[in-house]
Amino acid sequence: MRLKPLIGVAALLYLVTCSSTLHAQAAPDSNDSATAAQAPATSAPSTPANDEPTPMPRVAPAAYPMQEGFIDSRGVLIYYMTVGRGAPLVIVHGGPGASHDYFLPYLLPLARHNRLVFIDERGSGKSQKLDDPAGYTVENMVEDVEAVRQGLVLGKISLLGHSYGGVLAQAYAFKYQNNLSHLILCSTFPSTTQMNEVFVKMKQKMSPELRAHIDAAEKEGLFGHGKDYEKNRYTNDYMIAAWGEGYFPYLYGNKPDPNYDPIAAGIVPWDLYREMWGSHGEFVIDGNLKSVEYVERLPGIHVPTLIMVGDHDECDPSLSKEMHEKIADSQLVILPNSGHMTFVDQQKIFTTSVIDFLHPNLQKRNAAKAGS
């Protein structure tokens, strides 16, 4: 799908510090917890010309500082990037093997209300690669998230996970629930067995020609074929068939990405991908993620939880409905005309749902203003 004992405080390595700043056009709500001090307004001219209107005072646009660096998680350097102010919202990506990049720029509106902490998981994006792929496990990545929380001294965090990142977020909640204030699970699954059943149904809905083409490639074996540069990954032909024709209808709805390229989607750390997802194709998970069977553990999650899914998501909405039934203090949002990339298809609905969930008092104040 493309897209241990508690450790001590991790050593924070500011190997890279970015001094750039993102600017918003409007200042954050002054009553919100994420509000920062505004720059002083400039004074209007005291004696304007008689034929000119008195200019309105100008307020400097709010600035949202961005910082990036690395946290040493038991010898593995984990990349992070933060933007915004307020209570921390840690965001983990899917793949496995993608990076935080695909969240941008879509999640930036959340920075007006929270300090966003994007993480590249071990082996992914800018984070350190491992010599031994056996170190790519959900359990190790849970410890990496905890290392970032400790290293940045974040205190309690809200945690948002998308796709495989949602699996990681569930696993973090099982072990470190006391460190969570909120949990957000987006387009994800609680059971590999159930997800593999979804893949069977996806294949059944393909045209006979496409299904036969994919089945033949998977039967032959997906690695060691094609041109020399293709031998350690899926061939271009298989990526086009699986990620292009097979997956694309489940990725987007309202706003398909015109730049989506199934071959570019294959730019992943293949040793990680094969270790976790498996080597037998896109429509079966048989790597170490086959151990993900969380359904019976979900009732143990007691933090407020928001579950979001597209109405024709690759991670079928039935999976999110079951998570909602199992987690007592949970809300379920099914985004209309949306596939797996809900925050692309329905950016406004997505970001508004997250903001309302994390800041219910802000929602009440806005409703009061609208009614006054």
PLM region spans:
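Catalytic active-site module of serine/aspartate enzymes centered on a nucleophile-bearing elbow/loop
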Residues: 330-372
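Conserved hydrolase catalytic core segment
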Residues: 155-198
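Conserved HGGG/HGGXW glycine-rich cap/lid loop of the alpha/beta-hydrolase fold
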Residues: 76-129
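Conserved alpha/beta-hydrolase "acid-adjacent" motif
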Residues: 314-319
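Short beta-strand/loop motif that positions the catalytic acidic residue
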Residues: 301, 307-309
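Hydrophobic, aromatic-rich cap/lid helix
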Residues: 265-293
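Flexible "cap/lid" loop of the alpha/beta hydrolase fold
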Residues: 184-228
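Active-site loop/oxyanion-hole signature of alpha/beta-hydrolase fold enzymes
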Residues: 121-164, 352
